[in-house]
């Protein structure tokens, strides 16, 4: 009992002790008593906390899981997702629904392209930009896990062809001139066709310089950054000059940053407007704020225009605003003269076609006493005021906003605000750098393109090198590089211009993708068809290389011709250009000049006369400067042959073939119906230049052949082959002229139909009129003096028989000389009147037959018979300022000719490699009539050619 009591007391005491402890301290169980629960497999499980996902997440990111909760059988397929289109508008209209109404490929996120050559896949992720040329998409390459920029060209032939030029130029620059990527030119990776669209793959770059200025709130960049970018741009321009390439569209939007490289670098992009320096094509190029004076004035241009644009870019980088923000070309030129204190030199103004649009002649180029003074120099020209321009153009010029308080370059640069809180020493240092910048800009923006600095000269300026600037920079002289061929310049006049220059049309979308047709601009064909230097509108003359149907009015045909001139250069046949290089046969795309004739060679003579009615009326917007008189075009009255100058090297007559007619008696002595040309050849190359190529070529323009030195020349058989066509009971005996080197004799064996039995029975006595391209450069006046009076009298009679222009049903013979002797004249000077009209004989539909007296050479041809010029627009590129080329503008639906309602017929629609129709628009096509051939004529028994000839359609 006592034990129980004692034990109870101990328990009570222990309980009281525990109770007192529990009050003062927390309870801590023994570790051995409580252990973590372990399942049978022996691994501890994590504690899961149930967190409910927001509704937004379950219905967006986890939408597929939500659907599977509702329906375990649900399967997701990405191709069924509604597409997020990147192209606007996104409604399929053309190209079997792949293209919209603008012929842009309809792009959507996650669309993929595939290159058939490289087997590379490109998945579209975003749209970087778009323009009238097409679109630029940001694409992901799964194989390399990288991004690239893919330019998708519009599904139209003009854009396609121009994009091929860009591909060719960039490939050449990357692989040949800059294989190590050190000259800041964008890299091209790949190009391929996708759904009939040409796609070009470039490296992906960052923002352009304009966006950089915009981010900086249009405040100028620091001089150190301006110097860094300028040095890199000069490296790119030096590479272009070394390659003989003109960018033609240099501006801040086309210079992109490459932020992946440190320090930051830039790269020049967008070579869609680029061309070779010796094969310039377009006259309306460059964005307006960065357009050079020679382009504004319509003067022949070189790589110097890129240096002008570069100067404008450097000024804009420093100022934050464009230096010449003109609202129109007149406004830009006015600002240039005002800010720079100079004007273009007189030799440029004298030759430029747009001079009368912006300047007035206040003196004579030979007597500058009455002229104005600009920059301390006398000038025969003075810039028009706004009122004078309005009076001439019948509209007010658009004037842009004035951003600067000062009107000259030095004050604009000096007065630009300095950076806030800039130390005094830095202000003095920057002031000296600004003086160097002013001198640098003056050298880049020199009105005289011959004096404008080259990239190599500009790279040595103290502003670029960092040397102290103490005096105006005098660049080291450079040996000018003179190109062999004469520049070809095509105006954007309403008739053809931009598109027809390269054989293109913005309306032709249904074409098999073939290389660009053979032209001086893109000599890619293995063969060529000749034309004549003597016809108006033909630009493929002696040294240009004869080309396929390269009549300026048709580009691919033989019948469509526009009488249009622009001021590429003096239109003489053999003269000295500014570089001192003879240009045998210059482009007729030159300013028309009213020539001054001696007595007897007026409008009734054979020379060109503005009253002759043989030129089409001026198109709207054409400058009258094309028709200003010229003081150095004078025909010498005397010549041994009494038919005007006997050699094209002695006169300039727009390529008239009649300047050599005085040599007929000597040529006629050596020619007959059976003349083969082999035995009389002065050079063995003549035998190679005859026969084969001419045998399958039946062209007008005098049946001229091609040079043996032409890039696309074919080896020809010896001998001149004649072929006879019988139509309506009349035998037509035709011949073919050949061209050989300058050391060879150029002759013609072209014979003309005649209604007299004398010619049929005795063809040896029939006069063979030499072709305009068959002038013999080795022929001298001494040979003419050897002729007796009997030969001269027979020459006059025979020559008169060859002065008829006739046209038979065969359009290929439409430009022949008929041998009807009824038009002979006793006055030889009257036999030069309509020489240029050879180029117009095909414009007429339904020309009279060859024996029609009204079709003779001396007959007056009304001006209404020629086609007036029609407006022609060009496409535009991304960011391009002027309404032109790739920024440009917008193909028209069609062009209507004023005479006989002549419509341009497009080539037949073809299918691409994918079998899809290339041309979705409804247009009228012709399969049987090549360009230039009249639709009411037919040429039977056309000889087959060894190389397939491309018929481009008809402008009938």
From Swiss-Prot:
Catalytic activity: L-seryl-[protein] + ATP = O-phospho-L-seryl-[protein] + ADP + H(+); L-threonyl-[protein] + ATP = O-phospho-L-threonyl-[protein] + ADP + H(+); L-tyrosyl-[protein] + ATP = O-phospho-L-tyrosyl-[protein] + ADP + H(+)
Biased segments, Polar residues type: 622-636, 697-713, 725-757, 806-817, 838-849, 870-884, 902-912, 937-947
Cellular component GO terms held in the UniProt record: plasmodesma
Loss of function: phenotype: No visible phenotype under normal growth conditions, but mutant seedlings exhibit decreased sensitivity to abscisic acid (ABA) inhibition of seed germination, cotyledon greening, seedling growth, and stomatal movement. Decreased tolerance to drought stress.
Pfam families to which the protein is assigned, alphabetical: Pkinase (PF00069)
Binding sites annotated in the UniProt record for ATP: 128-136, 151
One GO-annotated biological process of the protein: protein phosphorylation
InterPro entries the UniProt entry points to: Kinase-like_dom_sf (IPR011009), Prot_kinase_dom (IPR000719), Protein_kinase_ATP_BS (IPR017441), Ser/Thr_kinase_AS (IPR008271), Ser_Thr_dual-spec_kinase (IPR050494)
Keywords: ATP-binding, Kinase, Nucleotide-binding, Phosphoprotein, Serine/threonine-protein kinase, Stress response, Transferase, Tyrosine-protein kinase
Source organism per UniProt: Arabidopsis thaliana (Mouse-ear cress)
Highest taxon above the source species: Eukaryota
Gene3D superfamilies for this protein: Phosphorylase Kinase, domain 1 (3.30.200.20), Transferase(Phosphotransferase) domain 1 (1.10.510.10)
One GO molecular-function entry: protein serine/threonine kinase activity
Protein kinase domain sequence ranges: 122-464
EC annotation from Swiss-Prot or TrEMBL: 2.7.12.1
SMART domains: S_TKc
Post-translational modification: Autophosphorylated at Ser-222.
Disordered, as annotated region: 620-657, 672-781, 806-956
Residues annotated as the enzyme's active site: 249 (proton acceptor)
Protein name: Dual specificity protein kinase YAK1 homolog
């Amino acid at each position: 009992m006592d034990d129980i009591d004692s034990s109870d007391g101990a328990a009570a005491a222990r309980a009281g002790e525990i109770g007192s402890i529990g009050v003062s301290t927390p309870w801590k169980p023994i570790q051995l008593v409580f252990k973590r629960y372990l399942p049978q497999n022996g691994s501890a499980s994590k504690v899961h906390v149930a967190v409910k996902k927001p509704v937004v997440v379950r219905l967006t990111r986890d939408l597929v899981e939500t659907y599977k909760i509702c329906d375990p059988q649900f399967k997701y397929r990405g191709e069924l997702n509604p597409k997020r289109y990147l192209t606007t508008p996104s409604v399929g209209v053309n190209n079997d629904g792949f293209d919209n109404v603008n012929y842009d490929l309809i792009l959507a996120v996650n669309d993929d392209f595939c290159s058939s050559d490289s087997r590379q896949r490109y998945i579209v992720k975003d749209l970087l930009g778009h323009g009238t040329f097409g679109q630029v998409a940001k694409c992901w390459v799964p194989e390399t896990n990288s991004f690239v920029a893919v330019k998708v060209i519009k599904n139209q032939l003009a854009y396609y062809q121009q994009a091929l030029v860009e591909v060719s130029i960039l490939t050449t620059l990357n692989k040949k001139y800059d294989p190590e990527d050190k000259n800041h030119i964008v890299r091209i990776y790949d190009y391929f066709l996708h759904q009939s669209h040409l796609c070009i793959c470039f490296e992906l770059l960052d923002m352009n310089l304009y966006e950089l200025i915009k981010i900086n709130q249009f405040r100028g960049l620091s001089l150190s950054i301006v110097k860094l970018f300028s040095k890199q741009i000069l490296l790119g321009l030096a590479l272009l000059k070394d390659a003989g390439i003109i960018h033609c569209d240099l501006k801040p939007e086309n210079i992109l940053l490459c932020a992946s490289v440190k320090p930051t670098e830039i790269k020049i992009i967008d070579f869609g407007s680029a061309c070779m320096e010796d094969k310039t094509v377009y006259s309306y190029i460059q964005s307006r704020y960065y357009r050079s004076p020679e382009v504004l004035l319509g003067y022949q241009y070189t790589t110097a225009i890129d240096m002008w644009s570069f100067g404008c870019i450097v000024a804009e980088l420093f100022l934050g605003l464009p230096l010449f923000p003109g609202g129109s070309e007149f406004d830009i030129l006015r600002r240039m003269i005002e800010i720079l204190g100079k004007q273009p030199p007189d030799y440029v103004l004298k030759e430029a076609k747009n001079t009368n649009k912006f300047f007035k002649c206040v003196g004579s180029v030979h007597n500058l006493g009455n002229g104005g003074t600009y920059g301390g120099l006398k000038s025969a020209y003075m810039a028009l005021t706004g009122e004078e321009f309005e009076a001439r153009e019948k509209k007010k010029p658009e004037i842009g906003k004035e951003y600067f308080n000062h009107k000259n370059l030095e004050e604009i640069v000096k007065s630009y605000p300095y950076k806030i809180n800039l130390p005094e020493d830095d202000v003095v240092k920057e002031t000296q750098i600004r003086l160097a910048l002013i001198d640098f800009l003056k050298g880049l923006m020199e009105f005289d393109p011959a004096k404008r600095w080259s990239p190599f000269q500009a790279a040595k300026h103290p502003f670029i090198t960092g040397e102290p600037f103490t005096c105006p920079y005098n660049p080291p002289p450079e040996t000018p590089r003179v190109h062999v061929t004469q520049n070809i310049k095509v105006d954007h006049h309403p008739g053809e211009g931009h598109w027809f220059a390269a054989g293109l049309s913005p309306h032709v979308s249904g074409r098999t993708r073939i290389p660009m047709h053979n032209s001086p601009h893109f000599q890619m064909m293995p063969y060529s068809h000749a034309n004549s230097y003597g016809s108006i509108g033909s630009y493929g003359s002696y040294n240009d290389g004869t080309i396929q149907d390269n009549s300026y009015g048709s580009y691919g045909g033989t019948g469509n011709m526009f009488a249009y001139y622009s001021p590429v250069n003096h239109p003489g046949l053999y003269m000295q250009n500014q570089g001192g290089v003879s240009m045998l046969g210059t482009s007729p795309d030159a300013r028309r000049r009213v020539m001054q004739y001696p007595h007897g060679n007026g409008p009734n003579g054979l020379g060109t006369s503005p009253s002759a009615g043989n030129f089409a009326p001026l198109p709207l917007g054409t400058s009258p400067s094309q028709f200003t008189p010229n003081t150095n075009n004078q025909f010498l009255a005397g010549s041994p042959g009494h038919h005007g100058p006997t050699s094209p090297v002695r006169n300039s007559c727009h390529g008239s073939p009649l300047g050599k007619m005085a040599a007929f008696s000597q040529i006629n002595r050596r020619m007959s119906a059976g003349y083969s040309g082999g035995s009389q050849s002065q050079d063995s190359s003549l035998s190679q230049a005859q026969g084969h190529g001419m045998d399958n070529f039946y062209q007008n323009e005098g049946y001229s052949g091609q040079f043996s030195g032409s890039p696309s020349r074919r080896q020809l058989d010896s001998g001149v082959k004649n072929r006879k066509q019988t139509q309506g009971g009349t035998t037509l005996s035709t011949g073919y002229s050949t061209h050989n080197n300058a050391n060879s004799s150029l002759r013609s064996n072209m014979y003309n139909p005649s209604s007299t039995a004398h010619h049929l029975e005795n063809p040896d006595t029939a006069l063979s009129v030499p072709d305009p391209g068959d002038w013999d450069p080795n022929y001298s006046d001494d040979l003419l003096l050897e002729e007796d009076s009997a030969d001269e009298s027979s020459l006059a009679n025979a020559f008169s028989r060859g002065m008829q222009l006739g046209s038979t049903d065969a359009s290929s013979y439409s430009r022949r000389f008929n041998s009807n002797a009824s038009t002979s004249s006793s006055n030889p000077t009257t036999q030069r009147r309509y020489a240029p009209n050879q180029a117009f004989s095909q414009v007429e539909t339904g020309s009279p037959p060859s024996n029609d007296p009204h079709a003779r050479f001396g007959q007056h041809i009304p001006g209404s018979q020629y086609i007036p010029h029609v407006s022609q627009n060009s496409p535009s590129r991304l960011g391009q300022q002027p309404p032109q080329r790739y920024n440009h503008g917008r193909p028209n639906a069609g062009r209507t000719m004023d005479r006989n309602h002549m419509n341009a017929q497009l080539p037949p629609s073809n299918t691409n490699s994918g079998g899809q129709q290339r041309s979705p628009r409804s247009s009228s096509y012709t399969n049987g009539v090549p360009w230039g051939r009249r639709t009411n004529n037919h040429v039977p028994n056309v000889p087959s050619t060894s190389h397939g000839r491309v018929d481009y359609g008809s402008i009938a």
